[in-house]
Amino acid sequence: MADTDCKWDPGADKYPLLGFGQAVIGPPGSGKSTYVRAMQALLAQMGRKSAIINLDPAGEDEPGAAVSLRELLGLEEVMSELRLGPNGALLYCMEYLQENLDWLRGRLQGLRGTYFLLDCPGQVELYTHHPALPDVLRRLGAWGLRLCAVHLVDSHYCTDPAKFISVLCTSLSTMLHVELPHINVLSKMDLIEQYGRLAFNLDYYTEVMDLSYLVEQLTSDPFFRRHKRLHEKLAEVIQDYGLVTFMPLSIKDEKSLRLVLSAVDKASGFCFGETKQSLGNLMSVAVGADFQFTSYPSHDCRG
């Protein structure tokens, strides 16, 4: 495991804003790394400097990543030395990062002002109930990194009512646990027709409309018919909170990627400018003033 001596400049703390960025989260296979690379390419096209921060100790080093957790420790190393399985080793890596966060802080200080793309691990419990990663993200926020969580979910779950209800529960739990501005994304929309026919229009899934219709779709299966009451209660919880909606995304469609970036920029506050400007801008919005995003050309969130 690497030396964790802190190399950040304490004097730099007089500048409170480290930068803006996205914490890209979601289950395995949802397309996080592909999204990160596509988003970096889009940002470069728009003239916005960005850096990929690979926080997944399990994957191979992200091509072009400015910082990789594997510089500090790798999953295989932890599994070998501590005789842990893959899941236990990944949790250990996150806890190790949590305890040695000055290492990451020092690396990010050298990239101050860059737009950060945090490529996070795919283990679901890291976002739903384990404390390490949410604590890391909160502490980065306290150090001046304004993050928005981008939660990717494979759109194939829309083709199965039971799986979609499960995804809704996971998304809600993640939003409540991570406690960041949050954008849920249905990824791989270009493949959705290959997954099977949807029971409802796409808007039904993205806007999470009346879930009672989805529960009714489960009654054709004897197993789910026996647990209909459970699914009804889960649907009630999701709709009572009223927090979960999705944005559709196809990496092959630049327009959909720009729409996600625009939503992220608004959620994180990037559109409202740097620290000295942002309070006034936010207050203008709060009192109903006519705010023009074009006031800050370098922070144009319209794409």
Swiss-Prot record:
Annotated CDD domains: GPN2
Ligand binding (GTP): G29, S30, G31, K32, S33, T34, S187, K188, M189, D190
Annotated motif Gly-Pro-Asn (GPN)-loop, positions: 85-87
Pfam families registered for this protein in UniProt: ATP_bind_1
Site (Stabilizes the phosphate intermediate): N87
InterPro entries: Gpn (IPR004130), Gpn2 (IPR030231), P-loop_NTPase (IPR027417)
Keywords: GTP-binding, Hydrolase, Nucleotide-binding
Bridged cysteine pairs (disulfide): none
SUPFAM superfamilies in the record: P-loop containing nucleoside triphosphate hydrolases
Transmembrane segments: none
A GO molecular-function descriptor: GTP binding
Purpose: Small GTPase required for proper localization of RNA polymerase II and III (RNAPII and RNAPIII). May act at an RNAP assembly step prior to nuclear import.
Assembly description: Heterodimers with gpn1 or gpn3. Binds to RNA polymerase II (RNAPII).
Family membership noted in the UniProt record: Belongs to the GPN-loop GTPase family.
Name by which UniProt lists this protein: GPN-loop GTPase 2
Phylogenetic classification of the source organism: Eukaryota, Metazoa, Chordata, Craniata, Vertebrata
